[in-house]
Each structure stands twice: as structure tokens, then as C-alpha cells.
Amino acid sequence: MLAAMIRTLCAAVLAAACSISMSAAASAPTPQPVSTPGTDCAAITGPPPQSVPPTSVNTLRQAYLCVLEHYYSGPVMDSRALLKSALAAYTQDLIRRGADRADLRLPALTGNRDTDWAAFAKVLGTGDPAALRAAITGMVAGLHDNHARWVRPTPPPQGGPVGTGIAGVSAQQGPQFDPAARPPLFITKVLAGSPAAKADIRPGDIMVKVNGVPAFIGDSVNHNIIDLFAADPVRLTLKRPTTGRTRTVEIRQGPITRQPPKVTSKTLPGGAVYVQLPGFYEGAADQVIAKLQGRPEAVVLDLRGNGGGSPREVTRLLGAFAHGKVTSYFCPLKGECVPNRTDDSVRLLGSRLVVLTDRACASACDDFSAAVKGNGLGTLVGTRTAGAVSGPGEGYLLDDGSVLILPKVRHLGPAREIIDTIGVPVDHYAPMTALDLATGRDPGLAKALTLL
């Protein structure tokens, strides 16, 4: 789960793998009546209207003022930086389309947000809708905030969802790649019956190239291949780790079946219960607790690939393992931080806890992992979490039906430490490799069993 890049990756690799993108909005209030776009951005309370005007200069104005009014640091932000980011993206879009304008320059700005906007709007004139969309994307990207998003809802495709069926890759962190990713890049999940499955693409297959472009340049992941996933067909050069065989496969998007996220569980040797939680979606905590109603002596909670969700689900699930604990803080720009606490209405399980994490454990998953480690509630096994937890986002409706998602507060861990961009380190390092996936091994679970 939002911006153009998110939709690009989700369309090709499947939206189910993009839950980190959606977690920015997961903590917003439960939708009530539908919002109506007006002259200013308004807090969204339901699905955007289906019939809306195109993106205009006024839409960009709304986004600009919305950031200054509602974003965490908006009230003290230099508005000139926003306009600079917006025009940079606007002109780059024009250049890519061979439509640059000789008269298009950033006017002299004073730092007064109203007079600067008036000068900026005069330069734009009526504006180019595609370039205006790029400008909003660029302005939001300039915040460098993993929970700030601009979303343009698109109607579902006729005939149901389509994609390749590749539902995850090893370096993926929501709409982008982990900047700390190490080679190789490999597939982690393939949907049954999908075009990828029919092409005999399997978990563990190493992506050497995408449309002829290498997945890694030296030891650095090539972020440019993200956009290449949207090609239809897409050409993948794959290496099977069990045999070393390399082949090139061309895949066209086709019908896929999206299963809603669900909690799964099994009993491990020795009596411990393994529970896999794919996201902190509404009701997820109670689903996990229901799987543990037998009050097992030990629990292995698998949060690998968990892209986040609602902070309320985090505190509720933590309440099954401890009471009276501060789990995190939400801090405004000015004023006191507000502590989040375990939901002590939940009955304690009294179980030992091992949590499996990876670099795709993000947002609310970062939050949960930090609370477990910071409060000594259990042991973390796997790899460091994503560190994508700037703060919960709230949605604001713009006049073209798009939604701006902005955090109003900053997240801190239970000791008031910053988790965002850093992540939560594990107690025992046990990464999943391509060969592990291809052969059905699970080093994280194996390590958890030794601890229990």
C-alpha cells in the first residue's frame, strides 16, 4: 500500500506485497460519510467521489497549503522549499515529454507563503495536468517522509485484478527498495495460478535482470528497475539457486486472485505455537489472540513481510503479553509527547515470545518490534526491521479526488528513541536466503526453535 511508483510496483508485482504503502493511512479514523472536495483540503471521512475534475493549479495550491497547515513540521516549514520541489518535478515532467517552456522559471520568493504562491501560480498559468500531478508528487517526496503520500484512486480493472503474480521480492520495502539491500535480488512469493506460476517462476528464483537492466550494480540495488516492472510484457532473467541454471522469461499480466490477509498458525515440535501475521489490519490482534486461546507455553510470532497497519492493533496485541507498559510515543512538533500503552483489557497469555522480523517489517511492525525489545517482552530473530515509521498518517481530500496523506506527529520508541530510518535490531541474526526459499528451509524459525 499509493503514489505513482507504488501503483507501478503493485500493478506488476501485486498490490498484496505493498502493504507498507497502505500503512500510512491505516491509523486514520474509521470512514464515515463521503467527503466532498472544496476550495481547501479537508480531512477525508470516506471514499473520494467517483466524478471529479482533472488536476489543476488549484489542486496544487490545496496540496501546498495542506502540507503547511497539517504536516508535522508544516507550521514552521520554509514554504520556498515546497515550491522549489514542486517546480523541479513540474519542469522535469515537461522535459521528458518534450514540452518544456522558455518562460518557466521559479520567481523570486520571499518566504511569505501567500505572496509566494501568488507569484508561483502566475508563472504556471493554466498549468499542464500531467506536470501538475508530477509537481504534487515531487512536493510530497521533498518532505523525505516515509508516511507522507499522495494517492490518486483508480477504479478497479474490469474483469478483476491483473498482474504477474509475483507477490514479493527480497529487497522490497513497500514502493521502493531497501537502500541497505544486499545481492542477490530474489523472488519471495508467487501466487498460485498466476502468469508467473504458469511460467514456472518460484520463490527463491534470483532476478538477474529486468528488461535487460541488472538488478544490482556492484553491491547496490538498482532502484531504476522499479519502473520496469510496469512493462507489459516484462522480461525477467532468472537464476535458479538449486541448479545454477539461468533463463529469460517474458511474462504478460493476467488475471490474479487476491486473497484477503489472514492470520495462520501451526503447532511446532515441543508444543510452541507459530503464528504468521501479515499485517496489523483491523481485527488482526484478536485473530492472533484467538489462535492462542489455548495459552501455549511459547509463541513464535512471524512478522516477516508485515507492512504495518493500525497502531491500535499493535497496542491490543501487546496487551496479550504484558500490561502497564508504554509501547511508544506520538510527539507533536510542539508540546508533550503522548504515550501509547498496552491494552490491559486483553487477558495475559503468560507465554514466552519470539518474534521473527525482516527488512520488510515496517511501520506498525517496527512499532510492535520496538515495544517487544524495549520492554523485554520477548526475543527478536531474523534481520533488523525496516525503520519506516515516521508517524501515523491522516488523509486529506483534494479537489481532483486525490488524497494527501500526512503525519501530524512523530513516532518514538518506548524509551523515546527514534526508530524511523534506523529500524529495530534483532537479538539473533537469521536472514532468509534465495537457496533457503528454494529448498523450503527457514533459518529464522529454526533459530527460534533452538531458543525455545
Protein language model features and the residues they cover:
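Cationic-aromatic interfacial patches
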Residues: 28-85, 91-103
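Surface-exposed patches in mature extracellular/periplasmic domains of secreted proteins
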Residues: 70-83, 97-106, 126-132, 146-155, ...
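Bacterial N-terminal signal peptides
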Residues: 9-21
